[in-house]
From Swiss-Prot:
Primary site of residence: membrane
Native organism: Yersinia enterocolitica
Gene: flhA
Gene Ontology CC terms, in alphabetical order: plasma membrane
Alphabetized Gene3D superfamilies for the sequence: FHIPEP family, domain 1, FHIPEP family, domain 3, FHIPEP family, domain 4
Record field: transmembrane: 24-44, 46-66, 71-91, 121-141, 209-229, 247-267, 296-316, 446-466
Record's protein name: Flagellar biosynthesis protein FlhA
Length: 692
């Protein structure tokens, strides 16, 4: 065994599970050996029994599988099982023709049992049963499963672009991480591969059914010729012997084939849920007492027709009525959602206390009553999990944990509306319709969709609320399709990023310092208040967040402040030196890699005017300010057409002035100074803002 492992380049200390890699080659060798080598009857019995056991196992796995991809190996198993049955037919045909004249046990006990016991030793009945099984397998199960697999493969392939865009939208919104996005993309690809493989694998099963019919005819004709001409058997005796053996061989192969085909039909017709096929069938067939009562009434009427087997019909009528009564009793025991707690009247008003003072939450959300299931943990509301993912992703990217989102219902809002509050003030609102999907036009969608026209609440893109049945069509037309909870979560994520500096308070500053102290205690020792005050540090970090600069690199921030704070106390000046120290990461944020960067620049004449205005403290002339704003807007549009980041590169002395000036009118514009760009970067001006 050690030599075999070394020859196959396998580890010598194999565990049991490591032998699984040899299952495929061993099965192929077994199939080839059955086709070439003559096998004794006992080995044939073992292989026929193994084939039956394999088919039953495959059917049960298909029944208990909850997702199609949980049994992604099924097309390959279908191929191997088909080859196994055909090789068994070849081996059994060989032994029937060679030793069939010796009696019914020539091909083994399994073939004899199927030929005698299952059809009563009557070859005419056996032929009829065999043909019926082949027709069921070939014309009904296999043909239907193949058609479903073909249509499923077509729809899965057509819907792949939309699914990929939906995954990218969730990733960009922070609803999922990179690992989860990779897993979902892999699932989409595997699903397309699976249905494509099933479309082809179904042809193997249909071919197997045809081969079974041909093999039966060949066995009967060949057996007659061999028995009469070579073994001098009577024609009637030869026909009976070889036909029974052939029927037994055909049945013992076709019954597993029928089971495997049924498993294929179960796999391609199931809907992916958290329940297996049996649970879906039971819960959906037997969950309505009225259906049971009506079915019992029909059976009862049939049972009273003269000449009918009254006992059987009335027995099932009673069983259905009993089942309906039991289901009705279970449903009546479930508490209704309308039950409300009884409020006791207060005879005397209690004195007000400080606990009656309601403090405003840093971040809150109010929802209408139709959106309550989305935020109700007991009703498996998806929005709660998405909000947790948003906060975690934001903390990983920006460097601090945003406040908890306090969610409450508001009956004064429209039923499908929500609004997002920061310190009690509304900063965003929108609508979401559970059970429907928002089809967002990213700019390249084709055609229109029936539904309620609206706008994406996060980015203002044109969108339509559509029914679930139109989801695949919308994805094919190029729309980004997201569910209601994703719409709300994306809007919340956008607002948290937009108001990151406002949500960062002194408490978050202290918590961040405590976190840094755990990792680098020497760095923060005597830093507060020895070097800077907590207020100054908070203001510096807030200034960075206001311009979308991550504060994850607290080591660099603290070291820079420790170096410059003794000589400078102005938070804005300290922010400028910290930005220079963080220049590499700031540039990397907008220009990944180390190559050329495409930026907007300032005309030299305009730069001189701005420097003079800054030094003189006179401010910008109204006309100059308007021209600067208009040209900045045009340059921003050119950057967008080029696919370049909206970055304006200016002199270090002008950066803070222009950033404050452009922030209100062009919040998407990012202003960087020349000192924040490393020497290893090549700068190319795509647009120039001048005074003309």
């Amino acid at each position: 065994m050690a030599n075999l492992a070394a020859l196959l380049r396998l580890p010598g200390n194999f565990k049991d599970t490591q032998w699984q890699i040899l299952a495929g080659p061993i099965l192929i060798l077994m199939i080839l050996s059955m086709m070439v080598l003559p096998l004794p009857p006992f080995i044939l019995d073992l292989l026929f029994t193994f084939n039956i056991a394999l088919s039953i196992m495959v059917l049960l796995v298909a029944m208990f599988t909850q997702r199609t991809l949980d049994f992604a190996a099924f097309p390959t198993i279908l191929l191997f099982s088909t080859l196994l049955r055909l090789s068994l037919n070849v081996a059994s045909t060989r032994i029937i023709l060679m030793d069939g004249h010796t009696g019914a046990a020539a091909a083994g006990r399994v073939v004899e049992a199927f030929g005698h016991f299952l059809v009563g030793g009557n070859f005419a009945i056996g032929i009829v049963v065999f043909v019926i099984l082949v027709i069921i397998n070939f014309m009904v199960i296999t043909k239907g499963a193949g058609r479903i697999a073909e249509v499923g493969a077509r729809f899965v392939l057509d819907g792949m672009p939309g699914k990929q865009m939906a995954i990218d939208a969730d990733l960009n919104a922070g609803l999922i991480g990179e690992d989860e996005a990779k897993k979902r993309r892999s699932d989409v690809t595997q699903e397309a591969d699976f249905y494509g493989s099933m479309d082809g694998a179904s042809k193997f099963v249909r071919g197997d059914a045809v081969a079974g019919l041909l093999i039966m005819v060949i066995n009967v004709v060949g057996g007659l010729l061999v028995g009469v001409l070579q073994h001098n058997m009577a024609v009637g005796h030869a026909a009976e012997t070889y036909t029974l053996l052939t029927i037994g061989d055909g049945l013992v192969a076709q019954i597993p084939a029928l089971v495997i085909s049924t498993a294929a039909g179960v796999i391609v017709t199931r809907v992916s849920t958290d329940q297996d096929v049996g649970q879906q069938m039971v819960t959906q067939l037997f969950n309505n007492p009225r259906v049971m009562v009506l079915s019992a009434a029909v059976l009862g009427l049939l049972g009273m027709v003269p000449g009918m087997p009254n006992f059987v019909f009335l027995l099932f009528t009673a069983a259905l009525l009993a089942l309906a009564w039991r289901l009705r009793g279970k449903q009546s025991q479930q508490p209704t959602a309308a039950e409300a707690p009884v409020i006791q009247d207060q005879q005397q008003a209690t004195e007000a206390t400080w606990s009656d003072v309601q403090l405003e939450d840093p971040l809150g959300m109010e929802v209408g009553y139709r959106l309550i299931p989305m935020v109700d943990f007991q009703q498996n509301g998806e929005l709660l999990g998405r909000i947790r993912s948003i906060r975690k992703k934001f903390a990983q990217e920006m460097g601090y944990l945003p406040p908890v989102v306090h969610i409450r219902d508001n009956l004064e809002l429209p039923p499908a509306s929500y609004r997002i509050l920061m310190k009690g003030v509304e900063i965003g609102s929108g609508e979401a319709h559970p059970g429907r999907w928002l089809a967002i036009n990213p700019g390249n969608a084709v055609g229109t969709l029936p539904g309620e026209a609206t706008q994406d609440p996060a980015f203002g893109l044109a969108a339509v609320w559509i029914e679930s049945a139109l989801r695949e069509q919308a994805q094919i037309q190029g729309f980004t399709v997201v569910e209601a909870s994703t719409v709300v979560a994306t809007h919340l994520n956008h607002l948290i990023s937009q108001y990151a500096s406002d949500l960062f308070g002194r408490q978050e500053t202290q918590q961040l310092l405590d976190r840094v102290s755990q990792e680098m205690p020497k760095l923060t020792e005597d830093f507060i208040p020895g070097v800077v005050t907590l207020t100054t540090l908070h203001k510096v970090l807030q200034n960075l967040l206001m311009e979308r600069v991550s504060i994850r690199d607290m080591r660099t921030i603290i070291e820079t402040l420790a170096e410059h704070a003794p000589n400078q106390t102005d938070p804005y000046e300290l922010t400028a030196v910290v930005r220079v120290a963080l220049g590499r990461s700031i540039a990397q944020q907008w220009f990944p890699g180390t190559g050329e960067i495409q930026v907007i620049g300032l005309d030299a004449a305009l730069e001189r005017l701005l420097l003079q205005a800054l030094q003189g403290g006179s401010g910008l002339e109204p006309g100059l300010a308007d021209r600067l704003l208009e040209q900045s807007r045009q340059a921003l549009q050119r950057q967008e057409m080029l696919g370049a980041p909206p970055v304006l590169l200016v002199n270090h002395a002008l950066r803070a002035l222009l950033a404050r000036f452009l922030r209100r009118s062009l919040p998407q514009m990012v202003v960087l100074s020349n000192l924040e760009i490393g020497d290893n970067r090549q700068i190319r001006m795509t647009s120039t803002i001048g005074v003309a």
